[in-house]
Amino acid sequence: VNVKERHFDFSRDLTKTLEADDSILEKYLLRRGDCLITLTGSRGKRDYGFVAMVGNQNNYLLNQRVAALRFDQSVALPEFFQYYLASPSYRDMFFGYETGNVGQGNVGIKALLDPYVILPDIDTQKRIIEDVEDRLSVCDSIEQTVDTALQQAEAMRQSILKDAFEGRL
């Protein structure tokens, strides 16, 4: 599964395992609420460090170069950390740990363990999550409006060109 910002991309073929030892499943089976963050990409391009939270996806195993963060949900809500780990300030810090050769960039687990995070109480986390989701919903709506307008502009452009080359202008 490809981890993208706030979602998973299931469009590529997945590696399937028919059988797995119980010890493997215990260690690598993803659970609802796990936050995944990608640790490898192109050096200097920030094309990794993407965060998504496991929801209703079942029977997926953690892959190499992806970290899974699991929280005691009586203290820390995964949704809160999904948004925190995607924030510009965290991403700047995260990429400060980047190593690797000319082409490939890597960030190790130290980037996830070193930072000191001020953790608000659960009610405050819930309010922050709600506020972020409300604002992201507005962004999604604007993005949909822009996409629709671009499609309409392209259709109009094609119509104008058709009319021009059929002598109707």
Describe the residue ranges of each PLM region.
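Short, compositionally biased
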Residues: 48-64
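Short amphipathic beta-strand starts and helix->beta connectors
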Residues: 53-54, 97-101
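A short glycine-rich beta-alpha junction/loop motif
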Residues: 59-67, 76-79, 99-123
